[in-house]
Design a protein with these regions (language model features):
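Aromatic- and glycine-enriched glycan-recognition loops and surfaces
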Residues: 1-6, 60-65, 115-122, 242-249, ...
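Substrate-binding/active-site clefts of carbohydrate-active enzymes
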Residues: 1-113, 396, 413
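Generic structural signal for well-ordered alpha-helices
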Residues: 9, 70, 74, 121-125, ...
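Conserved alpha/beta catalytic core and glycan-binding cleft of carbohydrate-active enzymes
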Residues: 78-80, 95-284, 288-291, 320, ...
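C-terminal beta-strand-rich structural cap/linker in extracellular carbohydrate-active enzymes
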Residues: 391-428
């Protein structure tokens, strides 16, 4: 708090250990019948996919227990809010297992909906925001439950944000299965924009799910073993490293500007940490070798990791200056599959992404909402970010009337291949 940081706790109220010896499995409240323990009797009290127990959210003592748990963390440790784990599992009796959600309301409101769990989550968010009005609650939900992120007073579940979990899955799918020349621009745009209007989403490229043992970080998928012997800034970059650095920056900026109303960075992603996380366990001989983050990589002057960190800092500085993340104005004015271009308006900014592997976009006409003079506010190709410095920050881009791509004004810009540029309008 002294550093100006909010601290959220990952709270797990979606299930509990299947442990009768030192857990809650056999605890009774002093009477027999419904609501006499923490878990429903029979199959309803068990989570078959996770091998754990499911709380009886309709029981008064269970609600008292879980709500008092939230209050204890808030008051005793001064947490600023919670990221609720496994919300999809709570919302439905089928726990979301093997289900695909298309957006049909019948998938969300049926006999499969766990109304008692829904009620508990509403109570939890109401309590949280009454105790600490500035508190933040985030839901880990993959189903897209309507009104999850609307206030309880409106009939919603009261969460401030939901996690945009489809976005990292899409990036990993593209990186694993397709070369970047085959990436679909409309496919990317639809994935990033596929969220409920007026419900805020946390966008992110990767999290612990993509960085644990058995998986790979985005940086490693882009650059592979070159991350170990090709990251020296004292010599020219290889083709693999040059491509990896360029796409790593574009992926983060596109996710931040188009994927939601908040942005999450997993520890180390901001500078392209190469290795996964693996905690000591029997399967690895209780090794601490990968139980770490090598923060020194970003602090070493002769390594290229510093460029990725500098770009992360610049992205957040851009949001501090132009407040584009909380802005309701988000518009994609151009999607060009052949040229691999996306033109995005977010807040007051116009951002152009060129994912083409070889072709620079020179003299590219892009639409914009307001007339005037625009300058470069951020570009991924700057020397400070390990780029080639091909985009001039001194150039003035004047708009022309007449309309373009259903926007009232347009201007001409230059965006190199595998680069992204953000343009900001200068006040008169």
């Amino acid at each position: 708090h002294g550093l100006g940081l909010l601290v959220l706790m990952d709270v797990v109220h979606s299930h509990a250990a299947d442990n009768a010896r030192d857990g809650l499995g056999e605890v009774r409240f002093g009477w027999d019948g419904p609501g006499c323990g923490y878990f429903p009797p029979g199959p309803a009290g068990h989570h078959p996919q996770w091998g754990s127990r499911v709380f009886d959210y309709g029981a008064w003592e269970v609600r008292r227990f879980l709500l008092s748990n939230l209050r204890w963390w808030l008051e005793e440790f001064r947490f600023d809010g919670f990221r609720f784990d496994g919300v999809t599992s709570m919302l439905y009796h089928h726990h979301g297992a093997g289900r695909g959600f298309s957006g049909n309301y019948a998938e969300y409101f049926s006999d499969e909906t766990n109304e008692e769990a829904v009620t508990y989550l509403m109570l939890a968010n109401k309590l949280l925001h009454e105790l600490v009005p500035s508190a933040v609650s985030v839901a880990e939900d993959v189903s897209g439950m309507p009104a999850l992120g609307r206030p309880v007073e409106e009939g919603g579940l009261g969460f401030d944000y939901r996690l945009g979990m489809a976005v990292p899955d899409k990036w990993i799918e593209l990186l694993k299965d397709r070369p970047d020349e085959d990436w679909g621009m409309e496919e990317l745009m639809l994935t990033l924009c596929n969220r409920r209007y007026t419900e805020r989403t946390v966008a992110y490229c990767e999290s612990h799910d993509q960085s644990i043992v058995g998986d790979q970080t985005i940086a490693f998928r882009l650059m592979g073993p070159a991350m170990y012997d090709g990251m020296s800034a004292l010599e020219g970059a290889s083709v693999e490293v040059e491509r990896g650095l360029a796409l790593h920056k574009c992926i983060r900026l596109l996710t931040m500007c188009l994927g939601g109303e908040a942005y999450l960075t997993f520890m180390g992603n901001e500078f392209g940490h190469p290795e996964w996380v693996d905690f000591p366990r029997e399967g690895n001989g209780w090794s601490h070798d990968k139980c770490r983050r090598m923060w020194s990589l970003a602090d070493t002057p002769h390594l290229r990791y510093k460029f990725l960190l500098a770009f992360e800092e610049a992205m957040h500085a851009l949001d501090d200056l132009y407040a584009f993340l909380p802005s309701p104005h988000q518009l994609v004015s151009a999607v060009d599959e052949e040229a691999k271009l996306l033109v995005v308006e977010r807040g007051p900014l116009v951002l152009v992404f060129n994912f083409h592997t070889t072709e620079d976009a020179e003299g590219l006409r892009v639409g914009c909402g307001l007339p005037g003079k625009y300058r470069v506010a951020l570009d991924t190709d700057a020397f400070d970010f390990g780029g080639k410095g091909r985009v001039s920050h001194d150039a003035e881009h004047f708009t022309e009337p007449g309309g373009f791509n259903e926007r009232p004004c347009s201007m001409q810009v230059y965006v190199p291949a595998r680069c992204a540029v953000a343009f900001a309008r200068e006040d008169d």
